[in-house]
């Protein structure tokens, strides 16, 4: 089956490049569209204590850093990137909204294979929320012996 529009969900870690390369290799033979999305999962909702931080300035800085990182990934993809999206909130809902709006037929995301990722896997949540094909790519941190 040839996909028409692949959405790459990235966390902006160095491994995001691996996901982009994988999606581009799948898209090229069929001239499929490729888009990037980063979802800033809002963990502040889970924290009920007081924080003495200027959240407005911090959110602006984070937004700028996210935009810059997505732009860099897009420019280094070696393939045209249709959309570069950034959202915040519930990962599953943000992806579902993007899937509908941009007619996505494949979501590609990574899964870090460490203890915390196994315990709090985003992939598990997505499997129950996203109703298009998904490709979950196992990612290993450099400390685990993966060579460049």
UniProtKB/Swiss-Prot annotation:
Localization (cell): Cytoplasm
Keywords: Cytoplasm
Pfam families documented for this protein: Usp
GO annotation terms (biological process): response to stress
Function field: Required for resistance to DNA-damaging agents.
Subunit structure: Homodimer.
UniProt-listed NCBIfam families: PRK15118.1
Full protein name: Universal stress protein A
Organism of provenance: Yersinia pestis
